Curated annotation (Swiss-Prot):
ATP binds at residues 478-485. Can form hexamers. Interacts with E2 protein; this interaction increases E1 DNA binding specificity. Interacts with host DNA polymerase subunit POLA2. Interacts with host single stranded DNA-binding protein RPA1. Interacts with host TOP1; this interaction stimulates the enzymatic activity of TOP1. GO terms for molecular function: ATP binding; ATP hydrolysis activity; DNA binding; DNA helicase activity. The keyword Nucleus does not apply. ATP-dependent DNA 3'-5' helicase required for initiation of viral DNA replication. It forms a complex with the viral E2 protein. The E1-E2 complex binds to the replication origin which contains binding sites for both proteins. During the initial step, a dimer of E1 interacts with a dimer of protein E2 leading to a complex that binds the viral origin of replication with high specificity. Then, a second dimer of E1 displaces the E2 dimer in an ATP-dependent manner to form the E1 tetramer. HAMAP family: PPV_E1. The lineage of its organism: Viruses, Monodnaviria, Shotokuvirae, Cossaviricota, Papovaviricetes. This is Replication protein E1. It is found in: Host nucleus. Belongs to the papillomaviridae E1 protein family. It catalyses: Couples ATP hydrolysis with the unwinding of duplex DNA by translocating in the 3'-5' direction; ATP + H2O = ADP + phosphate + H(+). It comes from the Viruses. Residues 187-353 are annotated as: DNA-binding region.
Length: 650
């Protein structure tokens, strides 16, 4: 290829090889064909075609085409990148995208690559179309645009990217900024389907209420008291169910019988089908969700077609409606009528709704031995459904005043009752209020376990209960965990005595509970407490009258009740309190309190056991004032603060 002649010869041969397509390599060449490239052929063909610049032209065209394709590819990639950034954050894509397509694209972004369809599909027309507001937020139908390839004329689809977002083809993006601005649609706006469902759900209850009023002639809300929470419990419910199948509506009464104590069923027909109105009282309290699930399973009706609220219990018109409709032939009744309907419709129940009587409330508190104000208020309010006076109490606007007055009067009556009884009568009264079945041996065995002789203890207890001077105080002394406090507390609980604490000794009123007590306990007396007793309470230990200071009241002179003291200090072993030695009787508890293998006390010091103990030792304790009770009756008159009433006549 150094000389021009040889190069031109090969070029001519190249054209001959292209023309001879069917000759194979290795075939023999005929002799009549000359491929030597002589001077004669070169001179004959040299002036026919000027091909000196052909290789350079082809090279330039190939370079330009490759450069153009590279530029177009970069432009396409840039346009795709810009659109991806623009629509990032809207994984749902267009609002018209179907749910299945959205799920598929979320699970596999490359699912569109495997599609065998033509891809030319438009979104279907929706049932509720959004009106065009003119602000460019209208939903538009998207078409797949075919973008022809610039190299070999092959088209490709470029309208949806991997994330399901609509993008613009390179041809449209190169036409100017106006085409891109037309595609600037806010994809994160609320879908029209969600808004429609929301409107339908909000308007559903209004539509049901309107249809109910049209069919039954009165408003549903006039019969019920709405509950805001679906989890609030109630026993009575008013249920309206729309579009019930006739066969299920007829069998509803028998289906509900196993769940309810009372059923009032009405069925009317309208354009929507059968509307069932039922007043039910369940056997136990239920909330709205439970009632919805029950009716949905029995009637095969969705919860959106139900109205469920509790009835108005204090509305006379509502009670009259249920009473009047129960007498007609459109209603089916099962069970006894609820008391709130009877109370407002029947004559006798109306007469029972009298005014509140405080004396009945006081009598109830006295008979049940309830003196705490909060306990009186709570337990008496629970009787509102069975007691007419309690119902009147609940209707009153002065409940707090009534509770305070009731508690005050009940405490006064109880204090007067205790003061009227002797110690023997009071112990007998406490025994009457205690159950039988106790074992007196547990108390005796515990005293024997602590090495306390039973007969001296019994003699001291007899003098202690009588309040004999110098015998009015018993001290239980011993190391910790020997059962002193347990023994003393069990006795005070049975006698229903009071407990005083030295921690309140800085107050002038810390001894005021002794004014109304039959027996008192001072637990865990320390050396400082013994010093205080030696200085100020010698007369109290003697059993003589003392003067007590009460808050907001005058000083009260009373005889100190029998006083039981527990202590880890033996006052008789210290001469500092030598003036107390003759005023107290000390019993020593030295052994730890015994427990069984389960951790329970080995000796049960209960009210039943104390009742059995006093019954067994009644004569030895000289509690013989009421020996003739069986013949003469009870000497204590039964308390009654309610005046007699004549039966009311109509």
């Amino acid at each position: 290829m150094a000389d021009s002649g040889n190069w031109e010869g090969r070029c001519t041969g190249w054209f001959n090889v292209e023309a001879i397509v069917e000759r194979k390599t290795g075939d023999p060449i005929p002799e009549d064909e000359n491929y030597d490239g002589g001077d004669t052929d070169e001179s004959e063909m040299g002036d026919f075609i000027d091909n000196a610049h052909i290789p350079n032209i082809y090279a330039q065209q190939e370079i330009a085409q490759a450069l153009y394709q590279s530029q177009q590819a970069n432009a396409d990639n840039e346009a795709i990148r810009v659109l991806k950034r623009k629509f990032t954050g809207s994984p749902g894509g267009s609002p018209d995208m179907k749910r299945d397509e959205f799920i598929d694209k979320q699970l596999s972004p490359q699912i569109n690559v495997l599609s065998i369809s033509s891809g030319r599909s438009t979104s279907k027309r929706r049932l509720f179309e959004e009106q065009d507001s003119g602000y460019g937020n209208t939903e538009v139908e998207t078409y797949e645009t075919e973008v022809p390839g610039l190299g070999a004329g092959v088209g490709c689809l470029q309208n949806v990217n991997e994330e399901g977002n609509q993008i613009v083809s390179p041809r449209e993006s190169s036409s100017g900024s106006s085409s891109i601005s037309n595609m600037d649609i806010e994809t994160e706006s609320t879908p029209i389907t969600d808004i429609t469902n929301l409107l339908q759900r909000n308007n559903a209850k209004a539509a049901l209420l309107a249809k109910f009023k049209e069919v039954y002639g009165l408003s549903y809300m006039e019969l019920v008291r709405p509950y805001k929470s679906d989890k609030t419990h109630c026993q009575d419910w008013v249920c309206a169910v729309f579009g019930v199948i006739p066969s299920l509506a007829e069998s509803l009464k028998s289906l509900l019988t196993q769940y309810c104590m009372y059923i009032h069923l009405q069925c009317l027909t309208c354009t929507w089908g059968i509307i069932v109105l039922v007043l039910v009282r369940f056997k136990c309290n239920k909330n709205r969700l439970t009632v919805q699930k029950l009716l949905s399973s029995l009637l095969n009706v969705t919860q959106e077609r139900m109205l469920i609220e509790p009835p108005r219990l204090r509305s006379t018109p509502c009670a009259l409606y249920w009473y009047r409709t129960s007498l007609s032939n459109i209603s089916e009744i099962v069970g006894d009528t609820p008391e709130w309907i009877k109370r407002q419709t029947l004559v006798q129940h109306s007469l029972d709704d009298s005014q509140f009587d405080l004396s009945q409330m006081i009598q109830w508190a006295f008979d049940n031995d309830i003196t705490d104000d909060c306990e009186i208020a709570y337990k008496y309010a629970l009787l509102g459904n069975v007691d007419s006076n309690a119902a009147a109490f609940l209707k009153s606007n002065a409940q707090a005043k009534y509770v305070k007055d009731c508690g005050t009067m009940c405490r006064h009556y109880k204090a007067a009752e205790r003061k009227q009884m002797s110690m023997a009568q009071w112990i007998q009264h406490r025994c009457d209020l205690t159950n039988d079945g106790g074992n007196w041996k547990d108390i005796v065995l515990f005293l024997r376990y602590q090495n306390v002789e039973f007969m001296p203890f019994l003699i001291t207890l007899k003098q202690f209960l009588k309040g004999i001077p110098k015998q009015n105080c018993i001290v239980l002394y011993g190391p910790p965990d020997t059962g002193k406090s347990h023994f003393g507390m069990s006795l005070i609980k049975f006698i229903q005595g009071v407990v005083i604490s030295y921690v309140n000794s800085t107050s002038h009123f810390w001894l005021s509970p002794l004014a109304d007590a039959k027996m008192a306990l001072l637990d865990d007396a320390t050396p400082g407490c013994w010093t205080y007793i030696d200085k100020y309470l010698r007369n109290a230990l003697d059993g003589n009258p003392i003067c007590l200071d009460r808050k907001h009241k005058n000083l009260l002179q009373v005889k100190c009740p029998p006083l039981l003291i527990t202590s880890n200090t033996n006052p008789k072993a210290d001469d500092t309190w030598k003036y107390l030695h003759s005023r107290i009787k000390v019993f020593t508890f030295l052994n730890p309190f015994p427990f069984d293998s389960n951790g329970n006390p080995l000796y049960q010091l209960t009210n039943e056991n104390w009742k059995a103990f006093f019954t067994k030792t009644w004569s030895k304790l000289d509690l013989t004032e009421d020996d003739d009770k069986e013949n003469d009756g009870d000497t204590v008159q039964t308390f009654k603060c309610v005046s007699g009433r004549n039966p009311r006549t109509v």
